[in-house]
A protein has these predicted regions:
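Acidic, proline-/serine-/threonine-rich low-complexity intrinsically disordered repeat tracts
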Residues: 20-22
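Acyl-donor binding region in acyl/amide transferases
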Residues: 112, 119-197, 205-226
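A detector of low-complexity, intrinsically disordered, Ser/Thr/Gly/Pro/Ala-rich segments
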Residues: 10, 32-35, 203
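Intrinsically disordered, low-complexity, charge-dense segments enriched in Lys/Arg
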Residues: 203, 214, 221-258
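Glycine-rich short-loop/terminal segments
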Residues: 24-146, 238, 243-246, 250-253
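Short acidic, low-complexity intrinsically disordered linear motifs used
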Residues: 1-16
Length: 258
């Protein structure tokens, strides 16, 4: 599975209009990744922006309602599902059914429509905040790690620096942007590809004819090159196209783990 957006228009309609139709493994993974990354961006936007400015938002005093995958609490599962669906973009961001949520460890803030889930493989998903609470990044990410969360994914941008700050430094996969399957409601905010707090390519290097160039020097290189991005992750990109792609708000999707 390498193209995140493949068949997006087709399978998003299948999800909404024909839920009984089983999606292929490829489509299912792509739809899941898109839903989770956009939801996390909504949740952690304020925290990430504060971090860019050298600040950190204070964490609110919260308690969780919990449901354990090994012994699901039906009432918590129902409330979590309602919480997940309570946002203005819920029809687009919500991916999981109640039966799927039952198989995860759920953490829902008491009295608020905000929480997160952890799958059996350690994937942190369904991060959402449809409440007035702010400053949840520190609590959510720390609590997720303390309860078995080991990996997550996101669109490159302001979340890169935030997730790195909380220990998700191992970049193990990248899905490059595909304009044909750009997600609905995307805001196309420009991403600074040369800022390490907003891009995995900021300190990327490429060896061309035995000379090592940094990403800034590669800006005009209009050819496919293998570069070493954050954490030494190797990926083939066209640097010139990638600069323009990020400039016009079309970042890649990054998969991280502890």
């Amino acid at each position: 599975v390498k193209e995140l957006m493949e068949n997006w228009n087709k399978f998003i309609n299948e999800i909404k209009n024909a839920p009984e139709k089983k999606l292929s493994s490829h489509e299912e993974q792509a739809a899941e990744a898109i839903a989770n990354t956009l939801s996390a961006e909504d949740t952690f936007r304020d925290d990430a922006i504060a971090l860019l400015e050298g600040e950190e938002l204070p964490s609110p005093d919260i308690e969780y309602e919990k449901s354990d995958a090994s012994n699901p609490d039906e009432e918590v599962v129902k409330r979590f599902f309602v919480s997940l669906n309570s946002g203005k973009r819920s029809g687009f961001l919500t991916y999981y059914k109640k039966d799927e949520l039952k198989e995860m460890n759920l953490f829902l803030i008491k009295g608020h429509n905000a929480g997160f889930a952890i799958k059996k493989d350690g994937d942190i998903v369904s991060v959402h905040n449809n409440s007035s609470l702010r400053g949840l990044a520190s609590r959510f990410l720390s609590d997720a790690k303390n309860n078995g969360g080991t990996k997550l994914d996101h669109f490159d941008g302001f979340l890169s620096g935030l997730y790195r700050r909380y220990g998700f430094n191992d970049v193990y996969e990248v899905y490059q942007w595909d304009e044909q399957y750009s997600p609905k409601q995307w805001t196309y905010e420009s991403v600074d590809i040369l800022n390490s707090k907003t891009s995995i390519y900021a300190e990327a290097t490429a060896n061309v004819e035995d000379v090592e160039y940094n990403m800034k020097e590669l800006k005009q290189a209009n050819e496919q090159l293998e570069v070493k991005a954050e954490d030494g992750f190797k990926i083939e990109i066209n640097p010139s196209e990638k600069f323009n792609q990020y400039k016009y708000g079309r970042p890649d999707v990054i998969f991280r783990r502890l």
